[in-house]
Amino acid sequence: MPAIVLIGAQWGDEGKGKATDLLGGRVQWVVRYQGGNNAGHTVVLPTGENFALHLIPSGILTPGVTNVIGNGVVVDPGVLLTELKGLEDRGVDTDRLLISADAHLLMPYHVAIDKVVERYAGSKKIGTTGRGIGPCYQDKIARQGIRVADVLDPAVLAEKIEGALELKNQVLVKIYNRKALEPAEVVENLLEQAEGFKHRIADARLLLNEALERDEIVLLEGSQGTLLDVDHGTYPYVTSSNPTAGGASVGSGIGPTRITTVLGILKAYTTRVGSGPFPTELFDEHGAYLAKTGGEVGVTTGRARRCGWFDAVIARYATRVNGITDYFLTKLDVLSSLETVPICVGYTVDGKRTDEMPMTQSDIARAEPVYEELPGWWEDISGAREFDDLPAKARDYVLRLEELAGAHVSCIGVGPGRDQTIVRRDILATS
């Protein structure tokens, strides 16, 4: 059976948790393959219960699904334990969560350095969440990181942390005038935390490939979005990992030929958190309307999201760099009650028209949107369950987005609940 990749096709916050939750009952495995607790998924169950997840895959809320934190994720042990306890306190079975032995651990010095560097950056800061994600990935690439499996050997763990702090403390004390961290204290705290998760450590790549050989379905769940990818996003205003579909293989250990479907998640308008270019951003009453009606506040950061009209340029770009086969369009209901609904179909940069993503970041920053206006609709669509239940103008909007994005819109979200979804094509049946 196939592996299916689920990715954000904009700047994150597209509603990936809803998509995972919808598919979760028909898959056997859900894998988080990159990022850390710098992103969040919100899942609303049919009972009305609302869950905000940051590290743990959304499949944890579906009985019978095995969930994996893959090797591409950076794991803050304290956040992991807090999230597990929060789920267990609400009656969620967490026994089905495994953690790749090769995932990297986010350490206290990563958080300290992240916060102080961002503070000293002043006006040039990139809007990091301050959770240590970037510094942890830096250590991973520099081959100085602490892996999850290291907690199984206290002597090796102590040696690695002592070596890391020789340099980190120099940076904290001599450059930023901060207090040094005690290696023994860091080791002791981590080993204490490890008692709460070391029974979950597994050879994830082996288990996942064995599952595929047994014809089980594996859903690979990305965090953030395409335009935040460190290689393909609006650099330097990006995350430190690869949320794009290519990162799914690297961050899970599943070979690319195993992947048969790439499901992109698109919000019916566009949002972004933090700094960076955003060609369709709105600063008027329409932006305020989208923010209020869409509840646009970051799950992890609590920061208000910047809002703008749908940008077909970045949707086409996401289709291309991810090889997207299907789209899940979310929050279509938010656009009800608008007289017209503009779609960005291209840009002008220094007076020249382009329908593609500009090659340089300076050009993206100067890009002015070219809009095509579609008539809006006034009906409440939250009860629609079939495509034909939508008003004609809402259907026209979806079909135009589909045409511009270059991939089939297979699912449409018309509200936050799991059941508030229109399925036009069964993604699993076509995989």
From Swiss-Prot:
Substrate binds at V299, T300, T301, G302, R303, A304, R305. Belongs to the adenylosuccinate synthetase family. Plays an important role in the de novo pathway of purine nucleotide biosynthesis. Catalyzes the first committed step in the biosynthesis of AMP from IMP. The active site is at D13, H41. Pathway: Purine metabolism; AMP biosynthesis via de novo pathway; AMP from IMP: step 1/2. SUPFAM superfamilies: P-loop containing nucleoside triphosphate hydrolases. Binds 1 Mg(2+) ion per subunit. Homodimer. Its main location: cytoplasm. Disulfide bonds: none annotated. Keywords: Cytoplasm, GTP-binding, Ligase, Magnesium, Metal-binding, Nucleotide-binding, Purine biosynthesis. Its cofactor is Mg(2+). InterPro entries: Adenylosuccin_syn_GTP-bd, Adenylosuccin_syn_Lys_AS, Adenylosuccinate_synth_dom1, Adenylosuccinate_synth_dom2, Adenylosuccinate_synth_dom3, Adenylosuccinate_synthetase, P-loop_NTPase. The keyword Calcium does not apply. This is Adenylosuccinate synthetase. GO terms for cellular component: cytoplasm. GTP binds at residues 12-18, 40-42, 305, 331-333, 413-415. Its EC number is 6.3.4.4. Transmembrane segments: none annotated. IMP binds at D13, E14, G15, K16, N38, A39, G40, H41, T129, R143, Q224, T239, R303. It catalyses: IMP + L-aspartate + GTP = N(6)-(1,2-dicarboxyethyl)-AMP + GDP + phosphate + 2 H(+). Mg(2+) binds at D13, G40. The keyword Cytoplasm applies. One of its GO terms (biological process) is 'de novo' AMP biosynthetic process. It is an enzyme of class 6 (ligase).
